[in-house]
């Protein structure tokens, strides 16, 4: 039997994708670098006739129908290049290699070009949803060689999550576009998680609410505008107690791991000149969390903060303020993420459909939320507008939330609570809507010490001037 698709890499994600494909009627050949994993997987599912395992890479490739479609679910970086190199002797022009791991988008750009020269079609595919999503329907973000997309679309769109009958999978763009969109997804995920943590910290440390009480609040919020996968599971995490009745959250060390995709998003934003302040703040917050011993030492040296504000007489009013702060900050986080996608689309000539990306994230992935429907509708109504902040719905939402948002941020800072992303969000909002900022002084200083010149606000853009700040005190146009 020749199978529909082959998959290399039988870790959790790879195995669950295979089972998902089989559930949807596709036959799958599997291979793993360590043959024991292949044998164990086949023993675990002995009745799946559509599942065939191989210990020889050549036999694995020869088992596939032409054009061959081979999906790599392995560690990003050198292992991907090594696997591609090992496969090439057995492939023919028109065969497809699919990298479904968390690869850096520029690596995917390079691989796409290198393999095209050899006649092999390459796809760099972002997959979100974790173990559960891979098994029952992930969000899939395919990019790479467009000739390969029609060959794999029936498989990917069958196994992807569905929302209102639409698969959370559609063509993203050429080269590294798929992996880039996945990286931005992960950056937004970092921001979402950090914002939820900061809201939890305020409710816990300022209002002195228990984990169980906060879980109840989040469960209610999940029925409102904040409805999302992350709010739902945050409520579940906070609610769970161990056999002794202690909330499990109270036993978890406050040190957060990361795999690097959030950092990639932050670095690319810096390289592209996009003010991704909230997501960068979320990445830095994870770095700071890893300094556990230093934080403990600092806590001993700088104990307590005198409260500037008294506890509210009606906590429910302040809880509503925190809700507004979280929702408004979430809008800013997504606005920044989509701004980055818009800039990358222009820079790399990808032609990204931002509304379609919002739909792809609507189900199956970690940041899935009802919120994304609104984003999709906004981009569908005005595709040229890449800023959520200018969309009518979000303009109204930000104005409605603003006072509670400000009260929350001021109260938290006054109480000495760390809120890097809530603060970054409102600072961005204020900076974004400031027509005449204080940054004129920064450019004046640059001209003073480095003769970097400046534009004048009473002259056309593109004219540059320099002032002799020390000697003649005169100004001249230099270009």
UniProtKB/Swiss-Prot annotation:
InterPro entries, per the entry: 6-PGluconate_DH-like_C_sf, 6PGD_dom2, 6PGDH_C, 6PGDH_Gnd/GntZ, 6PGDH_NADP-bd, 6PGdom_BS, NAD(P)-bd_dom_sf, Pgluconate_DH
Pathway field: Carbohydrate degradation; pentose phosphate pathway; D-ribulose 5-phosphate from D-glucose 6-phosphate (oxidative stage): step 3/3
One Pfam family from the record: NAD_binding_2
Keywords of the record: Gluconate utilization, NADP, Oxidoreductase, Pentose shunt
Active site, renumbered: 182 (proton acceptor), 189 (proton donor)
SMART domains, alphabetized: 6PGD
The protein's Enzyme Commission number: 1.1.1.44
Binding positions for NADP(+) per the UniProt entry: 9-14, 32-34, 74-76, 102
Binding positions (substrate): 102, 128-130, 185-186, 190, 259, 286, 446, 452
Catalytic activity as recorded in UniProt: 6-phospho-D-gluconate + NADP(+) = D-ribulose 5-phosphate + CO2 + NADPH
Gene Ontology biological-process entries: D-gluconate metabolic process; organic acid catabolic process; pentose-phosphate shunt
GO MF annotation, one: phosphogluconate dehydrogenase (decarboxylating) activity
SUPFAM superfamilies per the UniProt record, alphabetical: 6-phosphogluconate dehydrogenase C-terminal domain-like (SSF48179), NAD(P)-binding Rossmann-fold domains (SSF51735)
Family: Belongs to the 6-phosphogluconate dehydrogenase family.
Functional description taken from the UniProt entry: Catalyzes the oxidative decarboxylation of 6-phosphogluconate to ribulose 5-phosphate and CO(2), with concomitant reduction of NADP to NADPH.
Subunit-level organization: Homodimer.
Name of this chain's protein: 6-phosphogluconate dehydrogenase, decarboxylating
Organism: Chlamydia pneumoniae (Chlamydophila pneumoniae)
Phylogenetic classification of the source organism: Bacteria, Pseudomonadati, Chlamydiota, Chlamydiia, Chlamydiales
